């Protein structure tokens, strides 16, 4: 299938934003498909490419983390990666490159502010999937995406809490279960010696994922999220909760 000249001109403009040239060996039909929303074409849209792109951005993130932070533990890498591949992060990069200007989508869906983050994240992943499948590797992605991944990873590591495990856990539960974790916090027994502060347990549906304590509610929740990461995400174990 050949694209209309106007559409191919649009797509070339997008790739130039990524730093790629007009002679880049891409499959233009795949790039076009990556920017086609289901509201315009229920059968031929970016959903499958989004699936591929999800794996691609995880691979690219792991590559950057391994290269620049080789001494980091698997648990910490997993926490970092979960934020790097979260909808909020990917949507931000989609906005940066103005993907909405190239989407084939109905005006109503495009104008939906509530679905904006998911839309931009999904289309960004689909574009990554199209670029990867065009050549079978990261050569069209690594030159421009790695700098964003490294900058974001550096920003996260400079966080006062070192890693925002709560944000990482939230990104992970949304990706796998389409829901948010719940934190249940209670004060520690004030009558016992050395028992000041709070105890938090993080739940996913009916299943507790981790517990932790801290001097504040926020630090206790962070500790609970960190344990959940160490026990589940770092070991790539998917719990099977009942979610209402």
Curated annotation (Swiss-Prot):
Residues in RNase III domain copies: 11-136
PROSITE patterns noted in UniProt: DS_RBD (PS50137), RNASE_3_1 (PS00517), RNASE_3_2 (PS50142)
Subcellular location: Cytoplasm
All residue ranges annotated as the DRBM domain in the record: 164-234
EC number: 3.1.26.3
Keyword Manganese: no
Active-site residue numbers: 54, 125
Disulfide-bond pairs as recorded: none
Catalytic activity: Endonucleolytic cleavage to 5'-phosphomonoester
Pfam family, one: Ribonuclease_3
Binding site for Mg(2+): 50, 122, 125
InterPro entries given in the database record: dsRBD_dom, RNase_III, RNase_III_dom, RNase_III_sf
Keywords carried by this UniProt record: Cytoplasm, Endonuclease, Hydrolase, Magnesium, Metal-binding, mRNA processing, Nuclease, RNA-binding, rRNA processing, rRNA-binding, tRNA processing
Cofactor names: Mg(2+)
GO molecular function: double-stranded RNA binding; metal ion binding; ribonuclease III activity; rRNA binding
Main localisation: cytoplasm
A biological-process GO annotation: rRNA processing
Coiled coil segments of this chain: none
An annotated GO cellular component: cytosol
Record text on subunit structure and interactions: Homodimer.
Stored HAMAP family: RNase_III
UniProt family annotation: Belongs to the ribonuclease III family.
Cited function: Digests double-stranded RNA. Involved in the processing of primary rRNA transcript to yield the immediate precursors to the large and small rRNAs (23S and 16S). Processes some mRNAs, and tRNAs when they are encoded in the rRNA operon. Processes pre-crRNA and tracrRNA of type II CRISPR loci if present in the organism.
Protein name per its UniProtKB record: Ribonuclease 3 2
Species for this entry: Synechocystis sp. (strain ATCC 27184 / PCC 6803 / Kazusa)
């Amino acid at each position: 299938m050949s694209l209309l000249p106007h559409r191919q001109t649009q797509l070339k403009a997008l790739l130039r934003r990524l730093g790629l040239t007009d002679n880049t060996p891409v499959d233009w039909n795949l790039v076009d498909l990556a920017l086609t929303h289901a509201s315009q074409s229920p059968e031929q849209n970016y959903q499958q490419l989004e699936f591929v792109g999800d794996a691609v951005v995880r691979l690219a993130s792991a590559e950057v983390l391994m290269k620049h932070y080789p001494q980091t533990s698997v648990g910490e890498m997993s926490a970092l990666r979960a934020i790097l591949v979260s909808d909020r992060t990917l949507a931000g990069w989609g906005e940066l490159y103005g993907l909405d200007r190239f989407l084939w989508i109905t005006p109503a869906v495009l104008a939906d502010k509530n679905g904006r983050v998911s839309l931009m994240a999904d289309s960004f992943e689909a574009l990554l999937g199209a670029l990867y499948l065009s050549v079978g590797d990261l050569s069209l992605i690594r030159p421009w995406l790695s700098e964003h991944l490294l900058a974001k990873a550096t920003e996260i590591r400079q966080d006062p809490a070192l890693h925002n495990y709560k944000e990482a856990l939230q990104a992970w539960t949304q990706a796998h279960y389409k829901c948010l974790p719940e934190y249940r916090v209670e004060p520690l027994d004030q009558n016992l010696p050395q028992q000041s502060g709070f105890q938090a347990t993080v739940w996913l549906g009916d299943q507790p994922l981790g517990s932790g304590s801290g001097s504040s509610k926020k630090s206790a929740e962070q500790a609970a999220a960190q344990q959940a990461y160490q026990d589940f995400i770092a070991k790539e174990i998917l719990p099977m909760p009942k979610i209402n």
